Amino acid sequence: MTEDQLEQQCLEWFAEGGWEVAHGPDLAPDGEAPERADYRQVLLLADLEAAIRRINPHLPQSSVEQAVAVVRKPESLDVVVSNRDFHRLLLEGVPVEYKALTPALSQRERGEERLIQDRAFLVDFGDLNSNRFRAINQFTLEGSKQLRRPDVVCFINGLPLAVLELKSPGAENVNIWDAYNQIQTYKDECSDLFAYNEAAIISDGYLARVGSLTASQERYMPWRTLKHEDDKPLLEWQLETMVRGFFDRELFLDYIRYFVIFETDSDKLIKKIAGYHQFHAVREAVRATVIAARDMSDAGISEKRATYGDEVLPGSKKAGVVWHTQGSGKSISMCCYAGKLLQQPEMNNPTLIVVTDRNDLDGQLFATFSAARELLKQEPVQADDRDTLRRLLSE
C-alpha cells in the first residue's frame, strides 16, 4: 500500500464516522471551490463565522466579527502560549461586547443604550450536530522556507484542531518516527497551524500514535479503544482504531473539553493530553459517581459497568476505585475527573476533597491541580491541617 492509498483509506474511515471529507487543493486559493484567501491562511473563515452565528444566534454581526478577529490573530509569538490562549477561548468563549437598548418604560420613550459584555462560543459541546466536522487532505501551507502539505487536517467549525501525518506501510527505511519528524518541521515552519492544534497523529497504517503539541517521542501514545474501555477491536490497522475511536465526533469533543492540561515545568510551558486508559477510566468514573450520588428514589443504573466492577447502586455513595500502575499518569486522571465531574449538572456544584498520604505527593498534586485551574474553572486551595480543612469546608 502506498502513502496515497493509506491517505484515501484514512479519509474513508473519517467519512464513515460522520466527518465531511474534502480535497485540499479544491479549497485552495486557486482551487475549484476556494475557501482560503492565500496559502498562509490556516482557518476556514466562512465555516468559523457561520458556526459562531449558529451557536450564538443572539449576538449581532459586529460581535461575530470581533470573535473571528480575535481567533485569527494569536497574540503571542510563542506557539505554545498561543495554543494555551486559544484553548481557553475554545472552552470559555471569546469575550465580545455590543450595544443594546434596554426596554422602554412606555411606547413614547426610547430605551437606554448600554454596553453588553458577552462571550462568543466557537464550539457547541452540548449539541454535536451544531458543529461542522471536516477532514481535509493535502492542505497546502506557506511555510517559512517552502510550501508544506500535511496529509490530513481535521477541522471543527473551521478550526484546525488535529493534524495527521502518514507514511507508507510498504516503504523501506521509513517508519512513524519519520512522520514525527515531519510534524516537528511543520511546527517550526507553519506555526500558525499549531496555534489551534489539540492533537497530532503519526502513523504508517499498522502503527498509530497521538501526541500533544509539546510531546516528545516517548509521549506519543497508541489509542486502543473505540467507544469505551472494553471496545478494543482486533483491527489490522492501528490507524483505523485511531480514526474510529479517538476521532469519534462525540468522544473527540469530550476529549477537547476535559482531557487537555497545560503545566509549567522549569519555566517551560508544556501541554499534556490524556491517554486512552485515562480517557475511558475518567469517563466511567464520572458516570459511576453521578449514579452513586443520586437520591435513592431515582431510577436504577441504565447499563452494565465495565469489567472492573459489576454494578454501581444509585444513591449508594460508592462509585468504585480506579486502579492504574505507577507512572501511568494518575495525577492527570484525577484532574480530568475533577474537571469533568464539577461540570455535571446532576452533581449540583460539588466540593471535592483530594487526600494524599505523603507531604511531597500532596504538594506535587496541588501543583498539578493549580495548573489545571482553567479545566476546573476555579482556583484549588490547599489545607495543611484539619482546622484549615474545616474552615474551608464551612465557607
Model-found features: residue ranges?
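ATP-dependent helicase/translocase motor core
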Residues: M1-Q5, L11-L101, R114-T351, T356, ...
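Positively charged N-terminal leader segments that act as targeting/secretion signals
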Residues: T102-S106
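A cross-taxon signal for low-complexity, glycine/charged-rich
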Residues: Q107-E113
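Inter-Walker segment of RecA-like/P-loop motor cores
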Residues: A371-E395
